[in-house]
Amino acid sequence: MKLIIAAPSPYARKVRVSLQEKKIDHEVIIDVPWNKNTLTKDKNPLGKVPILITKDKQHIFDSKVIIRYLDQIVPNPKLYPSDHENELSTLTIEAIADGICDAVVLIRLENVRVNNLISKQWIERQEEKIFNGLKYLSKDLDSKNYFVDDDFNLSLIHI
């Protein structure tokens, strides 16, 4: 398998950790999606990373889809809990973590704009998402060691 990533991508990081946890052999290809001659646009119509290329040359993109695929082809260790309630909790944490990452990326992109075009309101809105997301995630960590269940699962990788 080959994994196309942009080195700073938090979404690629989740997939890389998942591949390591499952001990799946893979080759990492670092690409810059913003470059004119990027591989990414040829492999994903949205031009986004990460992209997993399977042994049969199938292109799987979006970190959530890739990790679901990995959990199906190598069942152990299980990244998504088997029971419905814990799976739903893990998916909720995944959504919060992705929202936090999205907000961080949007702040970074906003800060590289020309000074007079930077929107302080936009940045404040993204910072509020980050704060609220972290507050949500930390609300009951004082009483337990894991976000979901009493075992390692995808919720820890997301954070």
Mark where each language-model region is.
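Generic low-polarity alpha-helical segments
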Residues: 67, 157-158
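GST-like domain detector, emphasizing the conserved glutathione-binding G-site
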Residues: 1-124
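GST-like fold's C-terminal all-alpha helical module
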Residues: 97-157
